[in-house]
Amino acid sequence: MINRDNKKAITKKGMISNRLNKFSIRKYTVGTASILVGTTLIFGLGNQEAKAAENTSTENAKQDDATTSDNKEVVSETENNSTTENDSTNPIKKETNTDSQPEAKEESTTSSTQQQQNNVTATTETKPQNIEKENVKPSTDKTATEDTSVILEEKKAPNYTNNDVTTKPSTSEIQTKPTTPQESTNIENSQPQPTPSKVDNQVTDATNPKEPVNVSKEELKNNPEKLKELVRNDNNTDRSTKPVATAPTSVAPKRLNAKMRFAVAQPAAVASNNVNDLITVTKQTIKVGDGKDNVAAAHDGKDIEYDTEFTIDNKVKKGDTMTINYDKNVIPSDLTDKNDPIDITDPSGEVIAKGTFDKATKQITYTFTDYVDKYEDIKARLTLYSYIDKQAVPNETSLNLTFATAGKETSQNVSVDYQDPMVHGDSNIQSIFTKLDENKQTIEQQIYVNPLKKTATNTKVDIAGSQVDDYGNIKLGNGSTIIDQNTEIKVYKVNPNQQLPQSNRIYDFSQYEDVTSQFDNKKSFSNNVATLDFGDINSAYIIKVVSKYTPTSDGELDIAQGTSMRTTDKYGYYNYAGYSNFIVTSNDTGGGDGTVKPEEKLYKIGDYVWEDVDKDGVQGTDSKEKPMANVLVTLTYPDGTTKSVRTDANGHYEFGGLKDGETYTVKFETPAGYLPTKVNGTTDGEKDSNGSSITVKINGKDDMSLDTGFYKEPKYNLGDYVWEDTNKDGIQDANEPGIKDVKVTLKDSTGKVIGTTTTDASGKYKFTDLDNGNYTVEFETPAGYTPTVKNTTAEDKDSNGLTTTGVIKDADNMTLDSGFYKTPKYSLGDYVWYDSNKDGKQDSTEKGIKDVKVTLLNEKGEVIGTTKTDENGKYRFDNLDSGKYKVIFEKPAGLTQTVTNTTEDDKDADGGEVDVTITDHDDFTLDNGYFEEDTSDSDSDSDSDSDSDSDSDSDSDSDSDSDSDSDSDSDSDSDSDSDSDSDSDSDSDSDSDSDSDSDSDSDSDSDSDSDSDSDSDSDSDSDSDSDSDSDSDSDSDSDSDSDSDSDSDSDSDSDSDSDSDSDSDSDSDSDSDSDSDSDSDAGKHTPVKPMSTTKDHHNKAKALPETGSENNGSNNATLFGGLFAALGSLLLFGRRKKQNK
């Protein structure tokens, strides 16, 4: 029995294994013209299972018994009548004018969707009406303009057509009726019936075979072998091949078989739980319908096809799971709840994984069987069909659909399109099938009545349990439902502020007003038709119909149901608009009434893999030969899918379920460390080796002679010696020792490291178990050594350098050597000296400077050593390699860098920072010199303001002769208090009273390299009473260098009696403020002698005798000088005071 999964999936191509059917519905819509009395119900046909698809047609008929002129007047009025609808509440879509007028001639036919108008008798004239499909969006105005021509126009034919697909006609016609509006109970139509055009708008088979298979159901019943052949052919059909749309060859409608189809290849292995990370997606695509426009016409049966191909890692084990995710806006089936996914099977029918579907997450979870433990390198191919979820997407919109295999996503932008209401005059209606219950044998239909909310009069809605022909005649036996008093019919009223979803599918009716009870007396049943009388309405209504159906004897679902709305216009004409929905299915089964022949015989291939020790390609010629286990063997089917298995402990393998006459390929994976043996080493096909790849055709029997042999690939060594080349000649001498613990690295031809080792105590190293090929050997230079010269002599005695290439060709290679010699070390340094004569040259009398810090930096600027000069000024850095260095001298405190680079490098000064390069020698030429320099800094700034106010009247005659010679070099800090009393007797008598108040404030700030700071504050209070007649001649020569800080208070009283009488009264007030800032730098530093020591110009020291009597003349001059200084000070202070006042 073929895997049916309780789902029907037979097509004219025969039994399809591993298919799941999904139901969808298409529509036929009929818009009917206004007629007078005796209206015929017109229902078009449409089919669809897991999705809805309808065709629309309109009929416009009127018979006028008035005169021709009257008819013309009516026609004229109608032609010029333009109506505008404004509906801001309903998102029901576009209007499309689709009128047609039947031929008046009998037996005439047409093959197009446009019917020709023909004249009728002179007393009868048809009035063309405008049949419309109306699109009304919220707050959008639409104007329907009536045309004088009558044209039948299809609403979008579905875009995918199968060779098995049949078409259903949909026509509308104009009939002549009496002028008085009446209902006719006679469904028959006496007018001649033209042959309708065929419309490609119905359910198609999603299987899309490569070629049409024209075979009848009866033929399948009588010839079961033919059925099996069709199944096998379908399994081998390439999933990606899609047929070109062709003209249908049958008028029997066909149900859409939405399928999931798989093709697989090989096995795997790991722990349980989700193993999405072990699934590799090789291809993913999303296609809408025929893939031309990415428009998902949800009511026209356009499906979304998701194709995915993936491989399953060999680590996957039984019980592990992987996931497939649908987009949240789609569902696997549009009409039923049959969402169980198909099992994944290989071409022989063995199950690889079983799936379960989670409706909440829209995810399939596949659980792997033990198939993945038996086989390897499994490849799978999967095609999933789904449909727009009308609950998730209630209105037209654009979506980005995303599907995923094992978490790897792919996306596609699509536009969702829903059907239009069928409109003629005030009649506007649309319907779809919404749910199929095969267990209860019921079908649910939802009908929108007046979705455009027009003002409709004399409104009646018919629900017919059958298809109708092109003229409204009921056609029994071509699909039906049961419409009677047991049919569930519910009516709901739509409030003005409510919007109907464009999907034409209501999931929650509680939001609408249930007015079913209002139709208890307005509902009638007759001839499998229910009629509801709505009367005059301006609201929209929803009718939900749940009717019964009877399956056919072979289990097919021949279901059809139609509905129409009729109203009268202001002239009393009926306007018709209608839809019909239907489902027709094919049953996918292998049974029937005939006798099924026994299952087709299947065959197997396989045999043996062995180790061919003697490499002769023949089994059993050496006693050491043995079977090889765990060798991977892969079978490729004719369709390109594969499966793999490994040899068992006895070296055997086997593939079963193979079909006669088909060709397969067997490939053996060469085990690591082995090589394939000789092919066809004997004429005995049972004992030879067939090689790594074998192509075999099944010829009515098993083939267990497909063997292959391998032999171990020989291994080789590589290495030799690392030695100390003491004479640096690059040749291994007998007395030169090996170097131990040298690291050696081996790389393959791709640069990958395949081994590391170190030399032993004798300097030897070796790499083993190597195959033929090219290798690279790298030696790491030992610490304290330098590589010697390379390639100087014979290959086995020279040095190959730090990196060398070794080739193994069917033999060991022990010639890769490397030599090193000990790296010499060097020293650097010299001398730091006191360059007393500042000439930058080391003189024999100049001494070294001790404790000078010297820093050594390497080429990177890193400090590698510091030291200080010894007591002789010497310094040194040892154990240095050849290279670049920098020496930095730190200048001693108080000393100055001497001039640099004045003479030979070993006798001059190199400066504070010196760059030096050592190349295989010491360098003791890095010197530096410093000297001590006198430095004087003096900056003097003096600001003096003296104000002296003096009024003096003096009459004095004085004669004094004084000669004073003084040379003084003095740096002193003294505090002197002097009291002098002088008595002089002369011819002059002077009486003088002088009162002087002097206040002198001097502030001096001096910065000097002579370390001298002077702050002088002098306050002098002098009261002098002098009576003198004096004649003084004084010659004073004084050379004084003095820096002093003194505070002097002098009180002098002098009494002199002379012949002159002078009365003097002097009052002096002096205020002196002096601010001095001195900074001087003479570039020289002179030691400062003790402040108490003074020298004269001639360097003759002098001191005042304790008696104070030595050099009286000088003393007198000093006294008078002091008095005059005091007087001058008083005068200055008094002037300043006067100025201040």
Swiss-Prot record:
Gene3D superfamilies: 2.60.40.1280, 2.60.40.1290, Immunoglobulins (2.60.40.10)
Propeptide: 1108-1141
PROSITE patterns reported in the protein's UniProt record: GRAM_POS_ANCHORING
Membrane protein topology class: Peptidoglycan-anchor
Low complexity composition-biased segments: 77-90, 109-126
Major location (coarse): secreted
CNA-B domain sequence ranges: 602-714, 715-824, 825-935
Stretches for region Disordered: 54-248, 899-1117
Region (Ligand binding A region), start-end ranges: 53-601
Domain of life: Bacteria
Residue numbers bearing the Pentaglycyl murein peptidoglycan amidated threonine modification: T1107
Composition bias type Basic and acidic residues, residue spans: 61-75, 92-108, 130-145, 216-241
Signal sequence range: 1-52
Compositionally biased spans, kind Polar residues: 159-207
Subcellular location: Secreted, Cell wall
Key words of the record: Calcium, Cell wall, Peptidoglycan-anchor, Repeat, Secreted, Signal, Virulence
SUPFAM superfamilies linked to this entry: Bacterial adhesins (SSF49401), Hypothetical protein PA1324 (SSF117074)
Bias (Acidic residues): 903-913, 930-1080
GO BP field: cell adhesion
Motif (YSIRK-G/S signaling motif): 23-34
Entry-linked InterPro entries: Adhesin_Fg-bd_dom_2 (IPR011266), Adhesion_dom_sf (IPR008966), Fibrogen-bd_dom1 (IPR011252), Ig-like_fold (IPR013783), LPXTG_anchor (IPR019931), SDr-like (IPR050972), Sdr_B (IPR033764), SDR_Ig (IPR041171)
Subunit structure of this chain's protein: Interacts with host complement factor H/CFAH (via C-terminus). Interacts with host complement regulator C4BPA.
Family per similarity comment: Belongs to the serine-aspartate repeat-containing protein (SDr) family.
This protein's name: Serine-aspartate repeat-containing protein E
